[in-house]
Amino acid sequence: MSGLPRSVPDVLDPLGPGAPVLVAGGRVTGQAVAAVLTRFGATPTVCDDDPVMLRPHAERGLPTVSSSDAVQQITGYALVVASPGFSPATPLLAAAAAAGVPIWGDVELAWRLDAAGCYGPPRSWLVVTGTNGKTTTTSMLHAMLIAGGRRAVLCGNIGSAVLDVLDEPAELLAVELSSFQLHWAPSLRPEAGAVLNIAEDHLDWHATMAEYTAAKARVLTGGVAVAGLDDSRAAALLDGSPAQVRVGFRLGEPAARELGVRDAHLVDRAFSDDLTLLPVASIPVPGPVGVLDALAAAALARSVGVPAGAIADAVTSFRVGRHRAEVVAVADGITYVDDSKATNPHAARASVLAYPRVVWIAGGLLKGASLHAEVAAMASRLVGAVLIGRDRAAVAEALSRHAPDVPVVQVVAGEDTGMPATVEVPVACVLDVAKDDKAGETVGAAVMTAAVAAARRMAQPGDTVLLAPAGASFDQFTGYADRGEAFATAVRAVIR
Protein backbone atom coordinates (compact mmCIF):
# COMPACT_ATOMS: atom_id res chain seq x y z
CA MET A 1 0.00 0.00 0.00
CA SER A 2 1.17 3.55 -0.63
CA GLY A 3 -1.10 5.62 1.58
CA LEU A 4 -2.99 5.64 4.85
CA PRO A 5 -6.62 4.47 4.76
CA ARG A 6 -9.13 7.23 3.93
CA SER A 7 -10.86 6.48 7.22
CA VAL A 8 -7.90 6.35 9.59
CA PRO A 9 -8.30 3.61 12.25
CA ASP A 10 -8.08 4.70 15.88
CA VAL A 11 -4.83 2.75 16.21
CA LEU A 12 -3.15 5.29 13.92
CA ASP A 13 -4.43 8.41 15.67
CA PRO A 14 -2.97 11.12 15.47
CA LEU A 15 -1.19 9.88 12.34
CA GLY A 16 -3.20 10.68 9.23
CA PRO A 17 -2.77 12.00 5.68
CA GLY A 18 -0.77 15.23 5.79
CA ALA A 19 -0.14 15.00 9.55
CA PRO A 20 2.93 17.06 10.56
CA VAL A 21 5.34 14.64 12.25
CA LEU A 22 8.69 15.48 13.83
CA VAL A 23 11.28 12.73 13.33
CA ALA A 24 13.77 12.98 16.21
CA GLY A 25 17.12 11.72 14.93
CA GLY A 26 18.41 11.71 11.38
CA ARG A 27 20.51 8.55 11.39
CA VAL A 28 19.53 5.04 10.29
CA THR A 29 16.31 4.82 12.32
CA GLY A 30 15.30 8.35 11.36
CA GLN A 31 15.86 7.58 7.69
CA ALA A 32 13.57 4.54 7.87
CA VAL A 33 10.90 6.46 9.80
CA ALA A 34 10.96 9.43 7.40
CA ALA A 35 10.68 7.12 4.39
CA VAL A 36 7.68 5.26 5.84
CA LEU A 37 5.91 8.45 6.88
CA THR A 38 6.40 9.90 3.40
CA ARG A 39 5.18 6.69 1.79
CA PHE A 40 1.96 6.75 3.79
CA GLY A 41 1.21 10.41 3.18
CA ALA A 42 2.26 12.10 6.42
CA THR A 43 4.47 15.21 6.39
CA PRO A 44 7.74 14.51 8.25
CA THR A 45 10.29 17.07 9.43
CA VAL A 46 13.65 15.61 10.44
CA CYS A 47 15.40 16.92 13.55
CA ASP A 48 19.11 16.47 14.27
CA ASP A 49 21.89 18.70 15.57
CA ASP A 50 24.44 17.21 13.17
CA PRO A 51 24.23 18.94 9.76
CA VAL A 52 25.82 15.89 8.14
CA MET A 53 22.87 13.76 9.28
CA LEU A 54 20.35 16.28 7.95
CA ARG A 55 21.89 16.69 4.50
CA PRO A 56 20.51 13.46 2.93
CA HIS A 57 17.01 14.32 4.16
CA ALA A 58 17.22 17.85 2.76
CA GLU A 59 18.40 16.44 -0.57
CA ARG A 60 15.22 14.33 -0.65
CA GLY A 61 13.17 17.48 -0.19
CA LEU A 62 12.23 16.96 3.45
CA PRO A 63 12.15 19.88 5.90
CA THR A 64 14.90 19.73 8.54
CA VAL A 65 15.34 21.47 11.87
CA SER A 66 17.72 21.67 14.83
CA SER A 67 16.57 20.43 18.22
CA SER A 68 16.53 23.93 19.72
CA ASP A 69 14.32 25.21 16.91
CA ALA A 70 12.12 22.12 17.16
CA VAL A 71 11.54 22.82 20.86
CA GLN A 72 10.27 26.29 19.96
CA GLN A 73 7.95 24.86 17.30
CA ILE A 74 6.84 21.75 19.18
CA THR A 75 3.12 22.56 19.33
CA GLY A 76 3.06 22.63 15.54
CA TYR A 77 3.53 18.87 15.34
CA ALA A 78 0.83 16.24 15.71
CA LEU A 79 3.34 13.56 16.65
CA VAL A 80 7.02 12.99 17.45
CA VAL A 81 8.69 9.75 16.34
CA ALA A 82 11.95 9.34 18.26
CA SER A 83 14.98 7.16 17.63
CA PRO A 84 15.70 4.76 20.53
CA GLY A 85 18.74 6.72 21.71
CA PHE A 86 16.55 9.67 22.76
CA SER A 87 15.78 9.33 26.47
CA PRO A 88 12.72 10.95 28.08
CA ALA A 89 15.04 13.51 29.68
CA THR A 90 16.17 14.85 26.30
CA PRO A 91 15.05 18.52 26.17
CA LEU A 92 13.22 17.97 22.88
CA LEU A 93 11.17 15.06 24.17
CA ALA A 94 10.61 16.69 27.54
CA ALA A 95 9.18 19.69 25.68
CA ALA A 96 6.95 17.44 23.58
CA ALA A 97 5.64 15.67 26.67
CA ALA A 98 4.98 18.97 28.43
CA ALA A 99 3.05 20.21 25.39
CA GLY A 100 0.97 17.04 25.19
CA VAL A 101 2.42 15.96 21.85
CA PRO A 102 2.41 12.12 21.58
CA ILE A 103 5.83 10.45 21.32
CA TRP A 104 6.29 7.14 19.51
CA GLY A 105 9.36 5.14 18.69
CA ASP A 106 9.97 3.38 15.39
CA VAL A 107 8.67 0.12 16.90
CA GLU A 108 5.44 1.82 17.99
CA LEU A 109 5.04 3.22 14.47
CA ALA A 110 5.61 -0.23 12.96
CA TRP A 111 3.19 -1.87 15.39
CA ARG A 112 0.40 0.60 14.66
CA LEU A 113 0.84 0.50 10.89
CA ASP A 114 0.84 -3.31 10.96
CA ALA A 115 -2.17 -3.48 13.28
CA ALA A 116 -4.08 -1.08 11.01
CA GLY A 117 -3.59 -3.39 8.03
CA CYS A 118 -1.37 -0.98 6.13
CA TYR A 119 0.80 -3.90 5.00
CA GLY A 120 -1.96 -6.47 4.58
CA PRO A 121 -3.13 -8.91 7.26
CA PRO A 122 -1.33 -8.08 10.54
CA ARG A 123 1.56 -10.32 11.53
CA SER A 124 1.82 -12.17 14.83
CA TRP A 125 4.59 -10.58 16.88
CA LEU A 126 6.67 -12.83 19.16
CA VAL A 127 8.77 -10.46 21.24
CA VAL A 128 11.82 -11.15 23.41
CA THR A 129 13.33 -8.78 25.95
CA GLY A 130 15.40 -8.97 29.12
CA THR A 131 18.67 -7.63 30.41
CA ASN A 132 20.66 -10.52 28.95
CA GLY A 133 20.19 -13.30 26.42
CA LYS A 134 17.85 -11.44 24.06
CA THR A 135 19.80 -11.99 20.86
CA THR A 136 20.50 -15.68 21.40
CA THR A 137 16.91 -16.38 22.45
CA THR A 138 15.38 -14.46 19.54
CA SER A 139 17.72 -16.17 17.08
CA MET A 140 16.81 -19.58 18.52
CA LEU A 141 13.12 -18.69 18.29
CA HIS A 142 13.48 -17.72 14.65
CA ALA A 143 15.31 -20.98 13.91
CA MET A 144 12.51 -22.94 15.62
CA LEU A 145 9.83 -21.15 13.59
CA ILE A 146 11.65 -21.83 10.32
CA ALA A 147 12.25 -25.48 11.28
CA GLY A 148 8.52 -25.74 11.96
CA GLY A 149 7.72 -24.58 8.43
CA ARG A 150 6.46 -21.15 9.43
CA ARG A 151 7.05 -17.97 7.42
CA ALA A 152 8.99 -15.91 9.95
CA VAL A 153 11.33 -12.93 9.90
CA LEU A 154 14.01 -12.02 12.46
CA CYS A 155 13.95 -8.31 13.28
CA GLY A 156 14.03 -5.52 15.85
CA ASN A 157 17.25 -5.02 17.76
CA ILE A 158 18.75 -7.85 15.71
CA GLY A 159 18.72 -8.33 11.96
CA SER A 160 16.55 -5.72 10.28
CA ALA A 161 14.46 -2.95 11.84
CA VAL A 162 10.79 -3.88 12.13
CA LEU A 163 9.78 -1.08 9.76
CA ASP A 164 12.06 -2.57 7.12
CA VAL A 165 10.49 -6.06 7.14
CA LEU A 166 6.76 -5.30 7.06
CA ASP A 167 6.68 -5.60 3.26
CA GLU A 168 8.00 -9.17 3.47
CA PRO A 169 5.47 -12.03 3.13
CA ALA A 170 5.77 -13.25 6.71
CA GLU A 171 3.11 -14.48 9.10
CA LEU A 172 5.31 -14.25 12.20
CA LEU A 173 7.90 -11.77 13.43
CA ALA A 174 10.60 -12.89 15.88
CA VAL A 175 11.38 -9.53 17.45
CA GLU A 176 14.17 -8.61 19.86
CA LEU A 177 13.44 -5.34 21.66
CA SER A 178 15.52 -3.28 24.07
CA SER A 179 14.21 -1.24 26.98
CA PHE A 180 14.77 1.92 24.91
CA GLN A 181 12.54 0.64 22.12
CA LEU A 182 9.89 -0.60 24.54
CA HIS A 183 9.76 2.69 26.43
CA TRP A 184 8.56 4.38 23.25
CA ALA A 185 6.14 1.54 22.32
CA PRO A 186 3.24 2.05 24.75
CA SER A 187 0.53 0.34 22.67
CA LEU A 188 2.49 -2.83 21.79
CA ARG A 189 0.40 -5.97 22.40
CA PRO A 190 2.29 -8.96 20.97
CA GLU A 191 0.85 -12.39 20.26
CA ALA A 192 3.37 -13.62 22.82
CA GLY A 193 6.19 -11.93 24.69
CA ALA A 194 8.99 -13.09 26.97
CA VAL A 195 10.97 -11.35 29.71
CA LEU A 196 14.10 -13.42 30.27
CA ASN A 197 15.54 -11.61 33.29
CA ILE A 198 15.82 -8.15 34.84
CA ALA A 199 19.01 -6.67 36.30
CA GLU A 200 20.48 -3.19 36.67
CA ASP A 201 21.37 -1.78 33.26
CA HIS A 202 20.98 1.42 31.28
CA LEU A 203 20.34 3.49 34.39
CA ASP A 204 22.10 6.31 32.55
CA TRP A 205 19.08 6.34 30.17
CA HIS A 206 16.17 5.35 32.40
CA ALA A 207 15.58 7.62 35.38
CA THR A 208 15.04 4.72 37.79
CA MET A 209 15.16 0.94 38.00
CA ALA A 210 11.36 1.00 38.20
CA GLU A 211 11.12 2.76 34.83
CA TYR A 212 13.56 0.28 33.27
CA THR A 213 11.49 -2.63 34.60
CA ALA A 214 8.22 -1.08 33.45
CA ALA A 215 9.57 -0.78 29.91
CA LYS A 216 10.47 -4.47 29.87
CA ALA A 217 7.02 -5.41 31.19
CA ARG A 218 5.34 -4.11 28.04
CA VAL A 219 6.02 -7.37 26.21
CA LEU A 220 3.80 -9.20 28.73
CA THR A 221 0.61 -7.32 27.83
CA GLY A 222 -0.47 -9.43 24.84
CA GLY A 223 -2.05 -12.85 24.50
CA VAL A 224 0.70 -15.03 26.01
CA ALA A 225 3.16 -13.82 28.66
CA VAL A 226 6.37 -15.78 29.28
CA ALA A 227 8.99 -15.06 31.96
CA GLY A 228 11.94 -16.64 33.73
CA LEU A 229 10.89 -17.88 37.17
CA ASP A 230 14.47 -18.17 38.44
CA ASP A 231 14.72 -14.38 38.21
CA SER A 232 12.68 -12.73 40.97
CA ARG A 233 12.02 -9.50 39.06
CA ALA A 234 10.92 -11.30 35.90
CA ALA A 235 8.73 -13.66 37.93
CA ALA A 236 7.06 -10.68 39.63
CA LEU A 237 6.30 -9.15 36.24
CA LEU A 238 4.64 -12.39 35.16
CA ASP A 239 2.48 -12.41 38.29
CA GLY A 240 1.25 -8.92 37.42
CA SER A 241 0.73 -9.54 33.72
CA PRO A 242 -2.76 -8.99 32.27
CA ALA A 243 -2.18 -11.70 29.63
CA GLN A 244 -4.81 -14.42 29.35
CA VAL A 245 -2.08 -17.10 29.26
CA ARG A 246 0.90 -16.84 31.62
CA VAL A 247 3.80 -19.26 31.28
CA GLY A 248 6.96 -19.56 33.35
CA PHE A 249 10.22 -21.33 32.63
CA ARG A 250 12.85 -22.54 35.08
CA LEU A 251 16.02 -24.63 35.34
CA GLY A 252 14.27 -27.03 37.72
CA GLU A 253 11.40 -29.45 37.18
CA PRO A 254 8.38 -27.64 35.75
CA ALA A 255 4.96 -27.45 37.33
CA ALA A 256 1.79 -27.09 35.27
CA ARG A 257 1.87 -24.03 32.95
CA GLU A 258 5.68 -24.10 32.96
CA LEU A 259 8.64 -25.28 30.91
CA GLY A 260 11.67 -26.66 32.70
CA VAL A 261 14.23 -29.44 33.03
CA ARG A 262 13.58 -33.02 34.12
CA ASP A 263 15.99 -35.94 33.79
CA ALA A 264 18.39 -33.77 31.74
CA HIS A 265 15.70 -32.94 29.16
CA LEU A 266 13.70 -29.81 28.39
CA VAL A 267 10.04 -30.45 29.14
CA ASP A 268 6.89 -28.51 28.20
CA ARG A 269 4.00 -28.62 30.69
CA ALA A 270 2.44 -25.35 29.53
CA PHE A 271 1.26 -26.08 25.99
CA SER A 272 1.05 -29.86 26.53
CA ASP A 273 0.35 -32.12 29.49
CA ASP A 274 3.93 -33.39 29.57
CA LEU A 275 6.01 -33.12 26.39
CA THR A 276 9.74 -33.85 26.21
CA LEU A 277 11.41 -31.41 23.81
CA LEU A 278 15.15 -32.19 23.67
CA PRO A 279 18.14 -33.23 25.78
CA VAL A 280 20.04 -30.49 27.62
CA ALA A 281 23.27 -31.92 26.19
CA SER A 282 22.22 -30.89 22.68
CA ILE A 283 22.12 -27.16 23.53
CA PRO A 284 25.22 -25.52 22.00
CA VAL A 285 25.28 -22.49 24.34
CA PRO A 286 27.33 -23.40 27.44
CA GLY A 287 26.05 -23.35 31.00
CA PRO A 288 22.67 -22.59 32.57
CA VAL A 289 22.31 -19.50 30.39
CA GLY A 290 22.01 -21.65 27.28
CA VAL A 291 19.33 -23.80 28.89
CA LEU A 292 17.29 -20.76 29.92
CA ASP A 293 17.57 -19.21 26.46
CA ALA A 294 16.38 -22.45 24.86
CA LEU A 295 13.46 -22.74 27.30
CA ALA A 296 12.31 -19.19 26.60
CA ALA A 297 12.55 -19.63 22.84
CA ALA A 298 10.74 -22.96 23.06
CA ALA A 299 7.92 -21.41 25.10
CA LEU A 300 7.31 -18.76 22.46
CA ALA A 301 7.56 -21.29 19.64
CA ARG A 302 5.15 -23.67 21.38
CA SER A 303 2.69 -20.79 21.89
CA VAL A 304 2.18 -20.73 18.12
CA GLY A 305 2.13 -24.50 17.69
CA VAL A 306 5.69 -25.39 16.64
CA PRO A 307 6.13 -29.16 17.27
CA ALA A 308 8.77 -30.65 19.54
CA GLY A 309 10.74 -32.21 16.69
CA ALA A 310 11.24 -28.85 14.97
CA ILE A 311 12.34 -27.27 18.25
CA ALA A 312 14.89 -30.03 18.83
CA ASP A 313 16.22 -29.80 15.27
CA ALA A 314 16.60 -26.01 15.51
CA VAL A 315 18.46 -26.09 18.82
CA THR A 316 20.77 -28.93 17.82
CA SER A 317 21.88 -27.10 14.67
CA PHE A 318 21.97 -23.64 16.29
CA ARG A 319 25.22 -21.69 16.17
CA VAL A 320 26.03 -19.07 18.79
CA GLY A 321 26.58 -15.53 17.47
CA ARG A 322 29.97 -13.88 17.45
CA HIS A 323 31.31 -12.52 20.74
CA ARG A 324 28.77 -14.52 22.75
CA ALA A 325 30.63 -17.21 24.74
CA GLU A 326 32.71 -17.80 21.62
CA VAL A 327 35.71 -20.10 22.08
CA VAL A 328 38.59 -18.29 20.39
CA ALA A 329 41.35 -20.82 21.07
CA VAL A 330 42.52 -23.66 23.28
CA ALA A 331 46.28 -23.74 23.90
CA ASP A 332 48.44 -25.34 26.60
CA GLY A 333 45.30 -26.57 28.32
CA ILE A 334 43.87 -23.03 28.63
CA THR A 335 40.58 -22.09 26.94
CA TYR A 336 40.14 -18.50 25.70
CA VAL A 337 36.50 -17.36 25.51
CA ASP A 338 35.18 -14.13 23.99
CA ASP A 339 31.95 -13.05 25.69
CA SER A 340 32.36 -9.37 24.86
CA LYS A 341 28.55 -9.12 24.56
CA ALA A 342 28.36 -9.51 28.37
CA THR A 343 28.00 -5.75 28.72
CA ASN A 344 26.51 -5.61 32.23
CA PRO A 345 27.26 -7.27 35.59
CA HIS A 346 24.34 -9.71 35.37
CA ALA A 347 25.59 -11.05 32.04
CA ALA A 348 29.17 -11.26 33.30
CA ARG A 349 28.10 -13.29 36.32
CA ALA A 350 26.23 -15.78 34.15
CA SER A 351 29.25 -16.04 31.88
CA VAL A 352 31.75 -16.65 34.69
CA LEU A 353 29.51 -19.24 36.36
CA ALA A 354 29.54 -21.34 33.19
CA TYR A 355 33.20 -22.32 33.87
CA PRO A 356 34.88 -23.88 36.93
CA ARG A 357 38.11 -21.79 37.01
CA VAL A 358 38.27 -18.37 35.39
CA VAL A 359 40.81 -15.62 34.79
CA TRP A 360 38.37 -12.78 34.27
CA ILE A 361 39.04 -9.83 31.94
CA ALA A 362 36.55 -7.14 32.94
CA GLY A 363 35.84 -3.42 32.90
CA GLY A 364 34.48 -0.67 30.68
CA LEU A 365 31.48 1.62 31.18
CA LEU A 366 29.21 0.33 33.94
CA LYS A 367 26.30 2.67 33.16
CA GLY A 368 25.50 3.21 36.83
CA ALA A 369 25.27 -0.49 37.71
CA SER A 370 26.69 -2.06 40.88
CA LEU A 371 28.82 -5.22 40.75
CA HIS A 372 28.86 -6.26 44.41
CA ALA A 373 26.20 -8.99 44.31
CA GLU A 374 27.57 -10.38 41.05
CA VAL A 375 31.21 -10.50 42.21
CA ALA A 376 30.14 -12.16 45.47
CA ALA A 377 28.29 -14.84 43.48
CA MET A 378 31.21 -15.58 41.16
CA ALA A 379 34.10 -15.23 43.64
CA SER A 380 34.62 -18.98 44.08
CA ARG A 381 35.17 -19.41 40.31
CA LEU A 382 37.82 -16.69 39.95
CA VAL A 383 41.52 -17.52 39.96
CA GLY A 384 42.58 -14.10 38.66
CA ALA A 385 41.24 -10.86 37.25
CA VAL A 386 42.57 -8.34 34.73
CA LEU A 387 40.77 -5.01 34.77
CA ILE A 388 40.47 -2.57 31.88
CA GLY A 389 38.41 0.48 30.98
CA ARG A 390 37.19 3.65 32.60
CA ASP A 391 35.20 2.11 35.45
CA ARG A 392 37.70 -0.59 36.43
CA ALA A 393 38.11 1.01 39.87
CA ALA A 394 34.55 -0.07 40.69
CA VAL A 395 35.38 -3.64 39.65
CA ALA A 396 38.56 -3.55 41.74
CA GLU A 397 36.63 -2.34 44.77
CA ALA A 398 34.05 -5.12 44.42
CA LEU A 399 36.80 -7.72 44.10
CA SER A 400 38.59 -6.30 47.14
CA ARG A 401 35.42 -6.67 49.22
CA HIS A 402 34.05 -9.97 47.95
CA ALA A 403 37.04 -11.85 46.48
CA PRO A 404 40.03 -10.59 48.48
CA ASP A 405 42.23 -13.59 47.65
CA VAL A 406 41.92 -13.19 43.87
CA PRO A 407 45.06 -11.73 42.21
CA VAL A 408 44.30 -8.57 40.22
CA VAL A 409 46.12 -6.76 37.41
CA GLN A 410 44.89 -3.36 36.26
CA VAL A 411 45.72 -2.06 32.78
CA VAL A 412 46.06 1.73 32.47
CA ALA A 413 45.86 3.49 29.11
CA GLY A 414 48.06 6.57 28.84
CA GLU A 415 46.38 9.61 30.37
CA ASP A 416 43.69 7.48 32.00
CA THR A 417 44.37 7.97 35.69
CA GLY A 418 40.87 7.57 37.08
CA MET A 419 41.94 4.44 38.95
CA PRO A 420 43.81 4.19 42.24
CA ALA A 421 47.43 3.10 41.84
CA THR A 422 46.86 0.12 44.12
CA VAL A 423 43.92 -1.83 45.47
CA GLU A 424 43.63 -4.01 48.55
CA VAL A 425 44.33 -7.42 47.06
CA PRO A 426 47.21 -9.79 47.79
CA VAL A 427 48.68 -9.44 44.30
CA ALA A 428 48.13 -6.05 42.66
CA CYS A 429 49.85 -4.80 39.55
CA VAL A 430 49.32 -1.77 37.34
CA LEU A 431 50.36 -1.97 33.68
CA ASP A 432 50.57 1.31 31.75
CA VAL A 433 50.28 0.47 28.07
CA ALA A 434 51.41 3.99 27.14
CA LYS A 435 54.89 3.10 28.39
CA ASP A 436 55.16 0.06 26.14
CA ASP A 437 52.77 0.58 23.25
CA LYS A 438 53.33 -0.77 19.77
CA ALA A 439 53.40 1.54 16.80
CA GLY A 440 50.08 1.63 14.98
CA GLU A 441 48.00 0.06 17.77
CA THR A 442 44.85 1.81 18.90
CA VAL A 443 44.43 2.41 22.62
CA GLY A 444 41.89 -0.41 22.79
CA ALA A 445 44.15 -2.86 20.99
CA ALA A 446 47.09 -1.96 23.21
CA VAL A 447 44.96 -2.38 26.33
CA MET A 448 43.67 -5.78 25.21
CA THR A 449 47.14 -6.98 24.21
CA ALA A 450 48.40 -6.21 27.71
CA ALA A 451 45.29 -7.68 29.34
CA VAL A 452 45.47 -11.01 27.53
CA ALA A 453 49.20 -11.33 28.17
CA ALA A 454 48.61 -10.72 31.88
CA ALA A 455 45.75 -13.22 31.95
CA ARG A 456 47.90 -15.85 30.26
CA ARG A 457 50.55 -15.44 32.97
CA MET A 458 47.89 -16.04 35.65
CA ALA A 459 46.21 -19.02 33.99
CA GLN A 460 47.01 -22.69 34.55
CA PRO A 461 46.02 -25.73 32.46
CA GLY A 462 42.30 -26.31 32.90
CA ASP A 463 41.54 -22.61 33.39
CA THR A 464 39.43 -20.37 31.15
CA VAL A 465 40.61 -16.89 30.21
CA LEU A 466 37.25 -15.16 29.84
CA LEU A 467 36.47 -11.75 28.38
CA ALA A 468 33.13 -10.95 30.07
CA PRO A 469 33.53 -7.22 30.67
CA ALA A 470 30.38 -6.35 32.68
CA GLY A 471 30.43 -2.94 31.00
CA ALA A 472 29.92 -1.20 27.70
CA SER A 473 32.90 -0.79 25.39
CA PHE A 474 32.76 2.78 24.10
CA ASP A 475 35.47 4.14 26.42
CA GLN A 476 38.22 2.30 24.51
CA PHE A 477 36.55 0.52 21.57
CA THR A 478 34.01 1.28 18.84
CA GLY A 479 31.65 -1.39 20.17
CA TYR A 480 31.48 -4.82 21.78
CA ALA A 481 32.43 -6.46 18.46
CA ASP A 482 35.57 -4.32 18.18
CA ARG A 483 36.47 -5.28 21.75
CA GLY A 484 35.92 -8.96 20.99
CA GLU A 485 38.05 -8.79 17.84
CA ALA A 486 40.83 -7.10 19.82
CA PHE A 487 40.65 -9.97 22.33
CA ALA A 488 40.85 -12.60 19.58
CA THR A 489 43.82 -10.84 17.98
CA ALA A 490 45.61 -10.62 21.32
CA VAL A 491 44.92 -14.30 22.04
CA ARG A 492 46.37 -15.37 18.70
CA ALA A 493 49.48 -13.33 19.44
CA VAL A 494 50.01 -14.74 22.92
CA ILE A 495 49.61 -18.42 21.99
CA ARG A 496 51.75 -18.55 18.89
UniProtKB/Swiss-Prot annotation:
GO terms for cellular component: cytoplasm. Keywords: ATP-binding, Cell cycle, Cell division, Cell shape, Cell wall biogenesis/degradation, Cytoplasm, Ligase, Nucleotide-binding, Peptidoglycan synthesis, Phosphoprotein. Pathway: Cell wall biogenesis; peptidoglycan biosynthesis. Its EC number is 6.3.2.9. It catalyses: UDP-N-acetyl-alpha-D-muramoyl-L-alanine + D-glutamate + ATP = UDP-N-acetyl-alpha-D-muramoyl-L-alanyl-D-glutamate + ADP + phosphate + H(+). GO terms for biological process: cell division; cell wall organization; peptidoglycan biosynthetic process; regulation of cell shape. ATP binds at G130, T131, N132, G133, K134, T135, T136. Phosphorylated by PknA. GO terms for molecular function: ATP binding; UDP-N-acetylmuramoylalanine-D-glutamate ligase activity. InterPro entries: Mur-like_cat_sf, Mur_ligase_C, Mur_ligase_C_dom_sf, Mur_ligase_cen, MurD. It is found in: Cytoplasm. The keyword Hydrolase does not apply. Interacts with PknA. HAMAP family: MurD. Belongs to the MurCDEF family. Cell wall formation. Catalyzes the addition of glutamate to the nucleotide precursor UDP-N-acetylmuramoyl-L-alanine (UMA). This is UDP-N-acetylmuramoylalanine--D-glutamate ligase. It comes from Mycobacterium tuberculosis (strain ATCC 25177 / H37Ra). The lineage of its organism: Bacteria, Bacillati, Actinomycetota, Actinomycetes, Mycobacteriales. The gene is murD.
